[in-house]
């Protein structure tokens, strides 16, 4: 018997998608939320932080353009621009993503309705959601501000991310994907370093997952990029599932461990430059094609080969052996974990349950790692910081 869809735990959305405070039901809502949090088997600190976030969210009320003051730009991608903003009525610092779409009002309203499911996504591994609204031709999605930014930004400063840190990242991504699948029957569809956010409290959270089919369709033509994290089955247009997210996670881990997007694989000379020593393993072999491969442009990494055209890159992902970690610089457990994520046949690829009990994850879970300390020293953040008023909890 299929699982019953979770009942919405949002504040009453208005037809235009803004969240409105129903003061009469606020206490009841909070009690219902607390019951849902109990089902998640969270650590005490995680539960306290989530409860604090949800309590302050109750005070936000209706979101509207006039109530925001821009602080700085956090980043821009295919989807739109993200700003760090101050919500003046509540005093909260938020991240506001602005998506400009030339669409009819009916489509716009459908997107806003579909995005309301984000109110139900409450997990330590998912970026908190304040609400969505429309103004001046743009859809605004208001989220928790993560002061460490995204892992692609962290990678640019770090050069490479250590295996122990990536162990903690892997746990968070697996738990985030598991939560989305088990509690909401949704897959992420866009796992990559820029969609994994971190903060000075040491939290690691997923953002920008595909909850709105209409938004995905409306933005289908906006892709501009030099790299792809899509699985071979998705690129070929065949049926895909959460197994596709696992491929994307595996490819992201190789990129963050090695220090550059790993397709095509680095040759022996580049590996020596990257790691400062001779590195063993298949990753150092020349790719099987007779041509000299290029590579996507990147602001980090030491590959001087000409950039690969996007169609050439996609062809490589589908037809050539998958990326892997070079031997000799990473543990066998980490190498095996990545290999199981990057099996080209999705039926043979490890699933979320198998990955959660993998030796690499078990070891990473047991390791004492000061993720917050590493992050703050790497990107020059003060620790602890206060991404929201809840930081002191």
Swiss-Prot record:
It comes from the Eukaryota. Its EC number is 2.7.12.2. Residues 270-307 are annotated as: RAF1-binding. It catalyses: L-seryl-[protein] + ATP = O-phospho-L-seryl-[protein] + ADP + H(+); L-threonyl-[protein] + ATP = O-phospho-L-threonyl-[protein] + ADP + H(+); L-tyrosyl-[protein] + ATP = O-phospho-L-tyrosyl-[protein] + ADP + H(+). One of its GO terms (molecular function) is protein serine kinase activity. Keywords: ATP-binding, Cytoplasm, Cytoskeleton, Kinase, Membrane, Nucleotide-binding, Nucleus, Phosphoprotein, Serine/threonine-protein kinase, Transferase, Tyrosine-protein kinase. This is Dual specificity mitogen-activated protein kinase kinase 1. It comes from Cricetulus griseus (Chinese hamster). The gene is MAP2K1.
């Amino acid at each position: 018997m299929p699982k019953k869809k979770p009942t919405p735990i949002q504040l009453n959305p208005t037809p235009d998608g803004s969240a409105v405070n129903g003061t009469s039901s606020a206490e009841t809502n909070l009690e219902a939320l607390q019951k849902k949090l109990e089902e998640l088997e969270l650590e005490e600190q995680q539960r306290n932080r989530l409860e604090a976030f949800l309590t302050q969210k109750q005070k936000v009320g209706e979101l509207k353009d006039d109530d925001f003051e821009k602080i700085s730009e956090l980043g821009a991608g295919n989807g739109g621009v993200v700003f760090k903003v101050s919500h003046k009525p509540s005093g909260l610092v938020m991240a506001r993503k602005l998506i400009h779409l030339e669409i009819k009002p009916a489509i716009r309203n459908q997107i806003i309705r579909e995005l309301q499911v984000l109110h139900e996504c409450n997990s330590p591994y998912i970026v908190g959601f304040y609400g969505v609204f429309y103004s001046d031709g743009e859809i605004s999605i208001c989220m928790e501000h993560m002061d460490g930014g995204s892992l692609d930004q962290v990678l640019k400063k770090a050069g490479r991310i250590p295996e122990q840190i990536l162990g903690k990242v892997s746990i968070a991504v697996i738990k985030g994907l598991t939560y989305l699948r088990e509690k909401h029957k949704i897959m992420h569809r866009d796992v990559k370093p820029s969609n994994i956010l971190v903060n000075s409290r040491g939290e690691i959270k997923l953002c920008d997952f595909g909850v709105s089919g209409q938004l995905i369709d409306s933005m289908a033509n906006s892709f501009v990029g030099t790299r792809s994290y899509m699985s071979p089955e998705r690129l070929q247009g065949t049926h895909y599932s959460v197994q596709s997210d696992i491929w994307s996670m595996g490819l992201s881990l190789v990129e963050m461990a090695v220090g550059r997007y790993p397709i095509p694989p680095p040759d022996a000379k580049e590996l020596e430059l990257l790691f400062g020593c001779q590195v063993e393993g298949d990753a150092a072999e020349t790719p099987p094609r007779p041509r000299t491969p290029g590579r996507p442009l990147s602001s980090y990494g030491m590959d001087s080969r000409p950039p690969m055209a996007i169609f050439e890159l996609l062809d490589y992902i589908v037809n050539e052996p998958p990326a892997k970690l070079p031997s000799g610089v990473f543990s066998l457990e980490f190498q095996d974990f990545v290999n199981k994520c990057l099996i080209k046949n999705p039926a043979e690829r490890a699933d979320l349950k198998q990955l959660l009990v993998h030796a690499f994850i078990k070891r990473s879970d047991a390791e004492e790692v000061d993720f917050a300390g590493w992050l703050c020293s790497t990107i020059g953040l003060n620790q602890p910081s206060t991404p929201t008023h809840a930081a002191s909890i």
